[in-house]
Amino acid sequence: YLTGERRLPASHSDLASFLESESKRTLFANKVKKVMMMGGGSVIVDPTTGTKIVPDLSNNYTFDKDASAKVFTHLQEMSVPMVMVSRQAAAMVPLEPSFYDELVERSNDHPVAKLIKDSAKKGIEALWKRATAPSGSSERKSLPDDRDRDWFIKTFCGGQDSEQTSNDDIWPSILHFLPYDYLTTVAMVPEYFSRYFEPTIVEVNGVQHMIVDKVKDPEELKKLLKQILFDAFKA
């Protein structure tokens, strides 16, 4: 970390609201070095307007699509570099459910470790209910139609369909998770980024943005992700 540098988390909803003000956009552009996204980007090349990046279909963007679209637009207009950690990169370093059991065990049943495990379980169960809800249903909560039951089984259950319904406990069938949040956090550290991440560079108005869709050493990176969390609970 350079002297004076800070990492500040923010939702796209809050950031979009902040950037509505021209004076705040000016302040933001002067103070912020780059913005990390927990999700990917799609590149659009128009012969008239040039190149731009828009949010891809990552689940994180579906909670407030309008806000995500505004954030992407503002950041490119302000020439603030974006680093987008895509689901393709996360899929290269999947974590097994047993990792959370090991985390709780190694931490001697630390309440925060238990909370991490419970949050992972509740999160995947909620996504299961959204994915199995009918197209157009309010239960899907803006989840794209292609994120359906078949997608869920393929992505999280290794394609092994035990014919569970939306009301069944899906947790025993989960083979792995995609560690978006852990991966994005690690990507914030320059030495880790240069060592493990392989971004695609997209230039917009003379500014280089990075879409991270590959990692260089998946198994080594997975070990690092686990070890960082294990170490966090050492006495």
Predicted stretch roles:
Residues Y1-A235:
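N-terminal acidic, glycine/proline-rich low-complexity segments
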